[in-house]
Amino acid sequence: MVQRSDWYVRLFSLDVCMEVFVASGRHLFTSESVSSGHPDKMADQISDGVLDALLREHPKSRVACETLVTTGLALLSGEITSEAKDVDYVNLTRNIIRDIGYVDDAMGFNCDTCDVKIFLDPQSQDIGNAVDDNPEEGKSTGAGDQGLMFGFACNETGEFMPLPIALAHRIVNRLTEVRQQGEAPWLWPDGKSQVTVQYQNGRPEKIHTVVVSNQHSPEVTQDAIKAFVLK
């Protein structure tokens, strides 16, 4: 079996990626998914909410919004170019946090009492000069940021995602569903799941390990949590 250190080194080279999967024989692969109340996911949803609100009013808005979330604080910063005038960033942020489920100080975060700081400035005019529509050419001339991404689809699941991450997503999505439906009122918004799948010659062979971690109210017992999650 390929050693884990060798596994990670070889994955950086795309031309041997499939060779590693096929030649490594039996190996374990773990993926993690976090719920909507995890700080990283909260920050993503707030930044997405800012973008959506601006695009609804001005479809040509350019938004570079970063969000930091920590206990009792949501901080938004970045640069924005938009003709939208009616976006209330503070209330928008509080409503997103409320929808996630943070409505009680006991959870360590409360949509109504948390501090929301806004540091959103106009985008540099130098960037605007480079990317705004050019009337002489009748088209846009560039982008304000650049990125190079790659990925692939696989046939392990119906959503064309690798089995470990697909299963981890399903678990945290189900936890969120039962919490929002009131089936488990002791569940709080922050949670995560890790799923380890054993592969044989590049194909899923069996589920090796499942880890589920979730915030909860202090009165619920560990035995009750375990029985509920297993069910």
Please state what every model-predicted region is:
Residues 4:
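Cationic, low-complexity basic patches in intrinsically disordered or flexible, solvent-exposed regions
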Residues 11-14:
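Leucine-biased recognition of intrinsically disordered, low-complexity hydrophobic segments
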Residues 60-70, 193-202:
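Short edge beta-strands and adjacent turn/loop segments
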Residues 64-82:
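Short, charge-patterned binding micro-sites
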